[in-house]
Amino acid sequence: MNPNPQSTSSNFHQTELDKFAALANRWWDADGPQKPLHALNPVRLDYVAARVALPGARVLDVGCGGGLLSEAMARLGAQVTAIDLAPELVKVARLHSLESSVQVDYRVQSVEDLAAEQPGSFDAVTCMEMLEHVPDPLAIIRACASLLKPGGTLFLSTLNRTPAAFALAVVGAEYIARLLPKGTHHYKDFIKPSELAAWLRTAELQLQDVSGMLYEPWRNRARLSSRTEVNYLACAVKP
């Protein structure tokens, strides 16, 4: 796959784009390689909807993949723009949107480029399961902050850099239970909540909440939790 010609950003690993692009055709298969993501999606949606009135809100989904969260927010009435650097994923997202008749503005574009074009345009920005896959997470957060209107909210989810996260998200999920393709995650790129909080302060955002997100593979269900050792969600507001 060639780098996206529409983007001037270099804030991506081509191997990461290729890895997820290879999953494009089964992105919406609830029993496929993205099975855990399908289980996490209702939790992510509820977390956002509890903090932002989605009907009529302008929302940007950064690193949208095949559009699971994008479509879910649009179904609740949000005006969703969704971006990703993998053309294969955006194509799948657009096709599914046509099948479901849920309107989402999907684009192959970097968040940095969009921030240069449309600063201060969105009531909320979501960036889920993406920061641990890019070379410069702070640059992503800065761009997201720029895109928010004053009073807008940034929603993030990622993986904590702990022994528990390594054991469960890497060894357990990829090599033992085989819930995810091998190589999906790299432990060194996981992000501690304290690191995320520091980046949010640097981007002049005010951290509002950090909540754990627990995935139960034996039930294929996920829920919010007070434990942040593995997956966690965070939200921050632009003053």
UniProtKB/Swiss-Prot annotation:
Pathway this chain belongs to: Cofactor biosynthesis; ubiquinone biosynthesis
Keywords in alphabetical order: Methyltransferase, S-adenosyl-L-methionine, Transferase, Ubiquinone biosynthesis
GO BP: any one term: methylation
Organism domain of life: Bacteria
Pfam families: Methyltransf_23 (PF13489)
PANTHER family per UniProt: METHYLTRANSFERASE, UBIQUINONE BIOSYNTHESIS O-METHYLTRANSFERASE, MITOCHONDRIAL
Protein name: Ubiquinone biosynthesis O-methyltransferase
Organism (species): Xanthomonas campestris pv. campestris (strain ATCC 33913 / DSM 3586 / NCPPB 528 / LMG 568 / P 25)
Taxonomic lineage: Bacteria, Pseudomonadati, Pseudomonadota, Gammaproteobacteria, Lysobacterales
